[in-house]
């Protein structure tokens, strides 16, 4: 039986965290190629360090897109807000090592006269949803993201102009009878101008934390930590080197659900690491939104070049109102889980990925242009009818 009384912790990182800078650049490159060709192939990795950005990977798409990669990378860094001596969007040294996608990989993915499009690689992908928050996301991660988004908005608006782009948060929540009831600790480390006193930073952060957490949830003063080292002036890639794909738990469920191990950013939607994880979240969210379970975990698995999932696993953690085997069958009837079926159902061959690079790929509002389509709950009626 699952524990019902416990403390669970999740963390988030801001758009200016060095790894998130790299995720943003890599996804900006994906969007660039998909803008030129909706069926372009991209696997883009980014390294960022003091005044240097290096991009490497494999692509298949028009040369015109390749010629624009540096411009797109600089604009991504500018949008995040880096204009510091150690990392400035106009001044960093840029190196690009993108080359053509392997023909051996392409032949497994491409459709032919005798086969559908296959998966871009083997792997396992998980999706999860729960009823702890309106976004149907685990509460510790939801509030960790929300704190940093609130601070980022204040920085970009000028309300807290002395904040820097780099920041981290961590929220620990007390659960009673399986439901979150209050925060036991909150940690926020945020980059700042050298002239700002730590007490001013603490009070500004406190206001944003109080705005984000439900009433009465604030942790005790002695477990509210803001810049616990006492100083955070040097940050971003100047403070720590960043790499694409190193924040996969922040990107997903904050440790509250399993992870298949594959990162999302820098990958076009033929890569099932990304598209199948989005599909699994979409299905799990619709199950919970339909009231068929309070929690739902879905695992999908694929083989490179194979055009259908090898397995579909569902676990409602004892909260389900329906038979899980029947639920699995119904979900497979409602959504084609082939790599192409996922892309077509969620309309993933569009430049919608740079916006996913910070504050989570899940628990976001669907956008009018098709962004975050995997957050829609348009299967709810069909699921209810099926049961």
UniProtKB/Swiss-Prot annotation:
Parts of the chain that traverse the membrane: none
Main localization, broad class: cytoplasm
Pathway(s) per entry: Amino-acid biosynthesis; S-adenosyl-L-methionine biosynthesis; S-adenosyl-L-methionine from L-methionine: step 1/1
Assigned keywords, A-Z: ATP-binding, Cytoplasm, Magnesium, Metal-binding, Nucleotide-binding, One-carbon metabolism, Potassium, Transferase
Binding-site positions, ATP: 17, 166-168, 231-232, 240, 246-247, 263, 267
Cofactor mode of binding and number, as noted: Binds 2 divalent ions per subunit. Binds 1 potassium ion per subunit.
Intracellular or extracellular location(s): Cytoplasm
A GO molecular-function descriptor: magnesium ion binding
EC number: 2.5.1.6
Cofactors (names): Mg(2+); K(+)
Cellular component, GO, one term: cytoplasm
InterPro entries, A to Z: ADOMET_SYNTHASE_CS, S-AdoMet_synt_C, S-AdoMet_synt_central, S-AdoMet_synt_N, S-AdoMet_synthetase, S-AdoMet_synthetase_sfam
Catalytic reaction annotation: L-methionine + ATP + H2O = S-adenosyl-L-methionine + phosphate + diphosphate
Region (Flexible loop): 101-111
UniProt key word Magnesium: yes
Annotated positions binding L-methionine: 58, 101, 240, 271
Purpose of the protein: Catalyzes the formation of S-adenosylmethionine (AdoMet) from methionine and ATP. The overall synthetic reaction is composed of two sequential steps, AdoMet formation and the subsequent tripolyphosphate hydrolysis which occurs prior to release of AdoMet from the enzyme.
The protein's assembly and partners: Homotetramer; dimer of dimers.
HAMAP family cross-referenced by the UniProt entry: S_AdoMet_synth1
PANTHER family tied to this protein: S-ADENOSYLMETHIONINE SYNTHETASE
Family indicated by similarity: Belongs to the AdoMet synthase family.
Protein name (record): S-adenosylmethionine synthase
């Amino acid at each position: 039986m699952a524990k019902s009384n416990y403390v669970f912790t999740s963390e988030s990182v801001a758009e200016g965290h060095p790894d998130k800078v790299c995720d943003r650049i890599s996804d900006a490159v994906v969007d660039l190629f998909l803008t030129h060709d909706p069926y372009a192939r991209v696997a883009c990795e980014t390294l960022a360090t003091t005044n240097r950005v290096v991009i490497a990977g494999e692509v298949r798409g028009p040369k015109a897109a390749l010629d624009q990669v540096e411009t797109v990378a600089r604009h991504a860094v500018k949008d995040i807000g880096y204009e510091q001596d150690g990392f400035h969007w106009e001044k960093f040294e840029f190196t690009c090592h993108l080359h053509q996608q392997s023909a051996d990989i392409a032949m497994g993915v491409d459709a032919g006269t005798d086969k559908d499009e296959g998966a871009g690689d083997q792997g396992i992908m998980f999706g999860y949803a729960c009823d702890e928050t309106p976004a149907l996301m685990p509460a510790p991660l939801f509030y960790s993201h929300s704190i940093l988004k609130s601070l980022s908005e204040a920085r970009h608006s000028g309300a807290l102009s002395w904040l820097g782009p780099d920041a981290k948060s961590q929220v620990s929540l007390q659960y009673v009878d399986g439901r979150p009831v209050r925060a036991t600790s909150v940690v926020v480390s945020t980059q700042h101008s050298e002239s700002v006193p730590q007490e001013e930073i603490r009070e500004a952060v406190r206001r944003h934390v109080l705005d984000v957490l439900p009433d009465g949830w604030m942790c005790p003063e002695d477990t509210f930590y803001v810049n616990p080292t006492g100083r955070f002036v040097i940050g971003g890639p100047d403070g720590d080197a960043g790499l694409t794909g190193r924040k996969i738990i922040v990107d997903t469920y904050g440790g509250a659900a399993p992870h298949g191990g594959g990162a999302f950013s820098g990958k076009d939607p033929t890569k099932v690491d990304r598209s199948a994880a989005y599909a699994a979240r979409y299905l799990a969210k619709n199950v919970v939104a339909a009231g068929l379970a309070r929690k739902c975990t879905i695992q999908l698995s694929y083989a490179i070049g194979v055009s259908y999932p090898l397995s579909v696993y569902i676990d409602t953690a004892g909260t389900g109102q329906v038979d899980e085997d029947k639920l699995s069958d119904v979900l497979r009837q409602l959504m084609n889980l082939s790599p192409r079926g996922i892309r077509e159902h969620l309309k993933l061959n569009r430049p919608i990925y740079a916006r996913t690079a910070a504050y989570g790929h899940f628990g976001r509002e669907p956008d009018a242009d098709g962004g975050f389509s995997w957050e829609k709950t348009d299967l709810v009626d069909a699921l209810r009818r099926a049961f």
